[in-house]
Swiss-Prot record:
Keyword Transit peptide: no
The organism of origin for this protein: Macaca mulatta
Protein name per Swiss-Prot or TrEMBL: Interleukin-10
Highest taxon above the source species: Eukaryota
UniProt keyword annotation of Ubl conjugation present: no
PANTHER family in alphabetical order: INTERLEUKIN-10, INTERLEUKIN-19-RELATED
UniProt KW keywords: Cytokine, Disulfide bond, Glycoprotein, Secreted, Signal
One Pfam family it belongs to: IL10
Any one GO molecular-function label of the UniProt entry: cytokine activity
Subcellular location: Secreted
Signal peptide positions on this chain: 1-18
Quaternary state and interactors: Homodimer. Interacts with IL10RA and IL10RB.
Cellular component GO terms, alphabetical: extracellular space
Single Gene Ontology BP annotation: negative regulation of interleukin-12 production
Amino acid sequence: MHSSALLCCLVLLTGVRASPGQGTQSENSCTRFPGNLPHMLRDLRDAFSRVKTFFQMKDQLDNILLKESLLEDFKGYLGCQALSEMIQFYLEEVMPQAENHDPDIKEHVNSLGENLKTLRLRLRRCHRFLPCENKSKAVEQVKNAFSKLQEKGVYKAMSEFDIFINYIEAYMTMKIQN
C-alpha cells in the first residue's frame, strides 16, 4: 500500500515539475523570437527567390497589388490584423492557385507556404505580436483587386511576395521596438 502511494506522489511531483518548465520554454521562445525573426525572414526570402522569376515573368500587369496603404495598416493600429489576414490570404487563396500553374514550381511554392505557416505559428505563440481580431480595409482592397484580376491575380500576388515580406519585416521591427 505504501509503495503505490509513494508511486502516486512521485508521478504527481513529476507532473508538477514538468508544468513550469513548459511555460518557461514557451516564454523563452517568445523572448528569443526577435532574435530569430531575421532568420525566418531570410528563409522566406530564400524560398521566394526560387519562384520569383517565374511569377514576375508571368506578371504582365503594370498596377501594384500591395499598395502603400497596406504598409500603413501594418504600421498602424490595425497592423496585427492586417498581417494576420495577409498571411491567411496568401496561404488560402494565392499559394494554392500558384502551385497549380507549373509542376516545376509546385514544390517551391509549397516550401514558401510552409515557411509562412511557421512564421504564423510563432507569431500566434507569442501573443504580443498577433493579438487581434479587427478587419483591415487595405487587406480587403488587396483581396478585391486580386479577385478582379482573376487568373492574372496569382501572378501579380506571387510576383509581389517580396513586398509582403518587407511589410512583415516593418511590422515586426515596429513591434519589437515597442
